[in-house]
Amino acid sequence: MYRRIIKPILFSLTIERAHHVALLLLRIIGLIPGGRWFLRKCYTVRHPALEREVFGVKFANPVGLAAGFDHNGEAYRELAALGFGFIEIGTVTPRPQAGNPRPRVFRLPKDRAIINRIGLSNRGLDKTICHLRRPHEGLIVGCNIGKNTVTPPENAAADYLRLFRNLYQYADYFTVNISCDNSCREGTTYTRTHILQILDPLFDFRRGQNQYRPIMLKVSPDMSDEVIDEISDILLETPLDGIVATNGPMAPDKIGRGRLSGAPLTQRAVEVVRRIHTRSGGNFPIIGVGGIMSPADAKAMLDAGADLLQLYTGYIYEGPGLVGEICRSLIADAEAAAAAKAAAEAKAREEIRAAAESEEAAKTAAATQTGIQAPETEKAAPGTETAATAQTQAAAPAESVPNPSPETQNSPARPADNEPDTRKKQPAS
């Protein structure tokens, strides 16, 4: 329905106007009794194989919506009803800011990409808090926070801390967005010292709270491999909970100023995720985002080491059905893996049983053969003699028999005492 009807209508509008229309329609559906239930019924896929527990938070599925779609937290409950496992709102800044002049967002349909130079447009901290106060039990909501454009880099830590403190009770996790906003031509180079100046006050504040809120750091694919390695090392040395990789890269000049998102980012985003995963030893959570346009892209990101996924441009081009497609693909992969594991275990058990039977048969055959050969060696066949027996008899000394005396030879044999004498008596002369 989205690809055949809704998408052509939305794509006939400018992307920013289409975005506002989509959010408005979602909010209207949310106001209708049973509206969010209907969306969940149509789009949500649930299965035990999809469930994840990452940085202490339980997710119904690993597919989330990236920051940048719902800047102010206006429709996060309706967006969650479209099947997302979690929603990340923002980027939120302490004070409202209008961003750059329009037009500032552009589609590249042939490349399935978007150029974005909005400039972190949002309605500020206070308005976001009003939206997050709405009941949202059971929903995982992350908050992407950043400094105001007019705030100098040396004062950035104060902006982040203000946002973190005031939103702490409303968000389930926080993403610290240190990327240069998309109004600039090149990404700002953040040193390790600068990053820690932003993060350390957040860690200090969190230590004094009763509830724990995970802190993620969002990185840009524009960063060199050396900088990405340094950020990965921060994971090992600080209480940072994980990395969101990646934001969009700055678009080439021939395309236009702004950040590029969509299919052209797929390969680089996977490379960054794999590098962070390898560098950190696979011991820290990674949210993979950037260029996920299909279930195959989602699988590649997870195989690279991502624990969770986020959609943005793929959601715009493919619609909410993409979430369900990815979830069903993950279920099929999990079931196939379980079946393969069961088959391998069954094969191993069969091999063990066959080996045991073969060994038992060999023992039985050996015992039977031994039992048959033993009597044959003890008793020779009638009428036959072994050579050894003949030699033994030949070597044995003959029994000495006394020579009979002449008298004994001439005298008749004497009957035994218990036998009658049957000899004839001779008459006396």
Predicted stretch roles:
Residues 113, 123-138, 191-212, 260-284, ...:
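Alpha-helix-loop-beta-strand connector modules within alpha/beta enzyme cores
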Residues 88-94, 178-180, 244-249, 298-325:
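Glycine-rich phosphate-binding active-site loops on the catalytic face of alpha/beta enzymes
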Residues 58-64, 138-143, 208-223, 279-288:
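Short beta-strand/loop segments at the ligand-binding rim of alpha/beta enzyme cores
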Residues 148-160, 188, 217-236:
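Active-site glycine- and acidic-residue-rich loops that bind
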Residues 99-112, 252-262, 315-339:
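C-terminal helical cap(s) of enzyme catalytic domains, especially alpha/beta-barrels
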Residues 74-79, 223-235, 292-309:
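Catalytic cores of alpha/beta
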Residues 90-139:
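A gly/proline- and charged-residue-enriched helix-loop-helix capping module
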Residues 36-45, 181-194, 228-282:
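Glycine/Thr-rich beta-alpha phosphate-binding loop at enzyme active sites
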